[in-house]
Swiss-Prot record:
The gene is CYP703A2. Involved in pollen wall development. In-chain hydroxylated fatty acids, together with omega-hydroxylated fatty acids, are key monomeric aliphatic building blocks for sporopollenin synthesis during exine formation. Belongs to the cytochrome P450 family. It is a single-pass membrane protein. It is an enzyme of class 1 (oxidoreductase). It holds the Pfam family p450. Its EC number is 1.14.14.130. One of its GO terms (cellular component) is membrane. Heme binds at residue 451. Signal peptide: none annotated. This is Cytochrome P450 703A2. The chain crosses the membrane at residues 2-22.
Amino acid sequence: MILVLASLFAVLILNVLLWRWLKASACKAQRLPPGPPRLPILGNLLQLGPLPHRDLASLCDKYGPLVYLRLGNVDAITTNDPDTIREILLRQDDVFSSRPKTLAAVHLAYGCGDVALAPMGPHWKRMRRICMEHLLTTKRLESFTTQRAEEARYLIRDVFKRSETGKPINLKEVLGAFSMNNVTRMLLGKQFFGPGSLVSPKEAQEFLHITHKLFWLLGVIYLGDYLPFWRWVDPSGCEKEMRDVEKRVDEFHTKIIDEHRRAKLEDEDKNGDMDFVDVLLSLPGENGKAHMEDVEIKALIQDMIAAATDTSAVTNEWAMAEAIKQPRVMRKIQEELDNVVGSNRMVDESDLVHLNYLRCVVRETFRMHPAGPFLIPHESVRATTINGYYIPAKTRVFINTHGLGRNTKIWDDVEDFRPERHWPVEGSGRVEISHGPDFKILPFSAGKRKCPGAPLGVTMVLMALARLFHCFEWSSPGNIDTVEVYGMTMPKAKPLRAIAKPRLAAHLYT
């Protein structure tokens, strides 16, 4: 029996090796992009370290704007070149707009049933249409203006209270709570932090922790996605951790949906103050069903919470860190705020379009510290060519936005935080926080997969920064490091701690 099993296993291995040899031979007949030498079976996996975005940028420096890699049994390309990125995301959007079905996406995005991680197809189109037509419309977002203003007030009161101790404030914690509250009030109709919270501090911190954990797992380069046999051993317990987070997140989502259904039964006339979950529960399902499936609602809830919370908080923390490191930048931000807003009132959302220097600060933050170092990887649905090179079907695409912002061919002094480089040439007009026609920064992707929540994300980032710099002077108790941690987002390795000193009249903080 053992001999038979061993023989079958040997035949299986030989078939796999033969298939890979035939595929490699077919690819060699075409001209693949240049890239580093590859090891048998592993390919280039060993060349990816703890900060793979920096590793891949180094490969682009060595081999050119488009680099081919073999990651285990997966073809992959990477680029940090604006023209190549434009080719992938716009000109060949129909080829590259799908997503790879990673184990993290299967476990943590309801079988890739969401918007962000779903492969291209009818399901993705339907889910994105729901977001764009029912959740992220201008009218719907404007209906939450009052709630966002309240959260901005709570943010300042929280920091003011902490500042009275004279001790450094953990800005990662403060900014995370601000982002979380903004999102959960729109999405779920309740706060998790602050005076209006109806949940215990322990539950709130657990929710924030599990959200960060989920986002980290979604971004991790898991060997089981590239070497199927790795899943049999899973020595680091990564897939086990995914299943654990999957279970805990699903329990939370089930509780949220049940709460909303009970509330609807108790108040059948509710129609004015509808949060996103209320809207989703009111929509018809597919194929004539009366309502959307719970799993679809959960997938959309997860997308909104994870994406909007983590990316905004990470961007704000980096912007604060860079501005506090450079008092010159902070002074220019505050001069603009004093000119536009004055010192007798707080910043409103209507002021944000007039804060061009602050918008330059955010653009420069996106250049140096993009929230997503690889965006979300794309996958080709069929074979194609880029820059004259053959790209096989099902090639994984890593668009290196971190490398893009530090590409010395398009930026000078790449390690210097200099917001002035984004100032309009004409000296007037609003500074746009998007990729623009030159594709020199890419905060929200482009093409079919462009982030549908970009306008909301920009508003949340600008409002937090405007309020914090308008209301307080900031200083650091020591040196501020700029070491990052890799994941789907790219936070600081050490939370930012800074000392706040109020700069406005005391009555404005109450």
